[in-house]
């Protein structure tokens, strides 16, 4: 009886779990927008925001061997005179021509390139000495827009900053002879509050705007101070890797800068096709579905995050070889993250901009690598068809929400779930009957 049960279980596994061959198997379907990370808006829509390294990307990437070895990450040390404004202090530094678009609040709606979005900074209701008036170990963060005026803001940028390049900077004291409090707070406390609604073509968002003069260096110990000028939002982390259209952003899962990394939840999977193609174990103790692609493989033949990372790095190496790009440009490519296949037109335009910067526009003519999957598979990037992913029809738009059906959890129809329980039930019955008979034999 036990043998027959095992045989039936094996047959069911072969029938239900036979790896499928997709009409258009996706070994690595990715898009490469200019954004570094994605963030979620209400409703779970995937958005991208740019960390802009224009206007001189090629110049400062090709003049140095590696970006990680430059002063971009650590800032620049500079001597500044007492009572010098931050805008004046950064003149002649690497940050002078740096435009940074930073979003620290995931409640914003999508914005255009002409919009300059500033960080989420706590302010008091009446513009008093709240967080914006404190320097702390990290220095005071301030946005500089087209002159000697600095802005510390939450919500909407000042109107005069719309469409202009700006610098989001922090000033950090580096010596004891430097700054007592980092920056003077007297002028900051006089900032004006403007609680209004900020509207773009994509919608409106309410926010508090605090307009302040540029902060001034202050010290009673010496005539000059030593400080470090750093970008407000540093270079993004190394890429997270995920399969196209098979992930969503987990709500409230953001790093310290407010940027969401790629994370799976159960609603992001295309259902039965994903399970059949990527493999799972139908049996007691086996994984019904691959809930998270975080390096821990659940199921037979499912690719891990490291697998995908290796593929992407291999492709980048091919780009390097084919186009003889400099190492600095390759590092720039590695720092460009990707989002799901349902890219907006804006992102597709930005893809072309990257191609112009890196002189690989011909390689980026298509937004995904779907046309080259066959070649990639022949080159060994896909170990087998079970390592490829079948794009669902239609493409699922990731959402964040509650699971309200069994198929969303298992990716499997209810009748398959019932078959599983029936098989497990038969096994339990066989084990119980066999145990009772064995117990009776022992008692005799």
Curated annotation (Swiss-Prot):
Record topology, Extracellular segments: 18-413
Membrane topology (UniProt): Single-pass type I membrane protein
Quaternary context: Homotrimer of disulfide-linked F1-F2. Interacts with Hemagglutinin esterase.
Chain positions covered by the region annotation Fusion peptide: 277-292
Function: Class I viral fusion protein. Under the current model, the protein has at least 3 conformational states: pre-fusion native state, pre-hairpin intermediate state, and post-fusion hairpin state. During viral and target cell membrane fusion, the heptad repeat (HR) regions assume a trimer-of-hairpins structure, positioning the fusion peptide in close proximity to the C-terminal region of the ectodomain. The formation of this structure appears to drive apposition and subsequent fusion of viral and target cell membranes.
Regions of this protein lying in the Cytoplasmic compartment: 435-444
Originating species: Infectious salmon anemia virus (isolate Atlantic salmon/Norway/810/9/99)
Annotated transmembrane regions: 414-434
Signal peptide positions on this chain: 1-17
Keyword vocabulary terms for this entry: Disulfide bond, Glycoprotein, Host membrane, Membrane, Signal, Transmembrane, Transmembrane helix, Virion
Pfam families per the UniProt record, alphabetical: Fusion_F0
Known glycosylation sites: 110, 359
InterPro entries on file: Fusion_F0_Isavirus (IPR025167)
Lineage: Viruses, Riboviria, Orthornavirae, Negarnaviricota, Polyploviricotina
PTM statement from Swiss-Prot or TrEMBL: The inactive precursor F0 is glycosylated and proteolytically cleaved into F1 and F2 to be functionally active. The cleavage is mediated by cellular proteases during the transport and maturation of the polypeptide.
Protein name: Fusion glycoprotein F0
Annotated site location: Cleavage: 276-277
GO terms for cellular component: host cell membrane; membrane; virion membrane
Domain of life of the source: Viruses
Keyword Signal annotated: yes
Localization per Swiss-Prot or TrEMBL: Virion membrane; Host membrane
């Amino acid at each position: 009886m036990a043998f027959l049960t095992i045989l039936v279980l094996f047959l069911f596994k072969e029938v239900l779990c036979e790896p499928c061959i997709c009409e258009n198997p996706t070994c690595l379907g990715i898009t490469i927008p200019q954004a570094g990370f994605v963030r979620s808006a209400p409703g779970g829509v995937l958005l991208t925001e740019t960390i802009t390294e224009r206007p001189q990307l090629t110049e400062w990437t090709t003049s140095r061997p590696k970006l990680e070895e430059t002063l971009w990450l650590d800032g620049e040390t500079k001597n500044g005179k007492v009572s010098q404004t931050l805008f004046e202090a950064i003149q002649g530094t690497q940050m002078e021509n740096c435009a940074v678009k930073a979003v620290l609040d995931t409640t914003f709606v999508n914005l255009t390139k002409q919009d300059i979005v500033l960080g989420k900074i706590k302010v008091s209701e009446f513009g008093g000495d709240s967080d914006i008036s404190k320097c702390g170990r990290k220095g005071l963060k301030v946005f500089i827009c087209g002159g000697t005026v600095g802005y510390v803001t939450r919500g909407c940028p000042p109107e005069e900053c719309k469409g202009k390049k700006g610098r989001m900077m922090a000033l950090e004291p580096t010596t004891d002879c430097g700054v007592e409090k980092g920056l003077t707070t007297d002028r900051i406390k006089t900032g004006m509050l403007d609680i209004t609604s900020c509207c773009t073509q994509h919608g409106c968002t309410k926010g508090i705007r605090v307009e302040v003069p540029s902060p001034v260096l202050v010290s009673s110990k010496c005539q000059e101070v030593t400080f470090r000028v750093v970008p407000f939002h540093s270079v993004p982390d190394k890429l997270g890797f995920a399969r196209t259209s098979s992930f969503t952003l987990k709500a409230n899962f953001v790093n310290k800068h407010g940027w969401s990394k790629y994370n799976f939840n159960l609603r992001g999977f295309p259902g039965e096709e994903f399970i059949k193609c990527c493999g799972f174990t139908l049996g007691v103790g086996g994984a019904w579905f691959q809930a998270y692609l975080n390096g821990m493989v659940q199921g037979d033949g499912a690719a891990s995050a490291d697998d995908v990372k290796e593929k992407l790095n291999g492709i980048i190496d091919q780009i390097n070889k084919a186009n003889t790009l400099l190492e600095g440009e390759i590092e720039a490519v590695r720092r460009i993250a990707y989002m799901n296949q349902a890219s907006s037109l804006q992102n597709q335009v930005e893809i072309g901009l990257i191609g112009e910067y890196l002189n690989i526009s011909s390689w980026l003519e298509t937004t995904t690598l779907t046309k080259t999957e066959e070649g990639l598979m022949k080159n060994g990037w896909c170990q087998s068809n079970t390592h490829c992913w079948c794009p669902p029809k239609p493409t699922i738009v990731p959402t964040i929400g509650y699971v309200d059906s069994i198929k969303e959890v298992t990716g499997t129809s209810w009748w398959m779930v019932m078959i599983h329980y029936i098989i497990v039930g038969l096994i339990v019955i066989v084990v119980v009957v066999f145990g009772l008979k064995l117990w009776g034999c022992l008692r005799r």
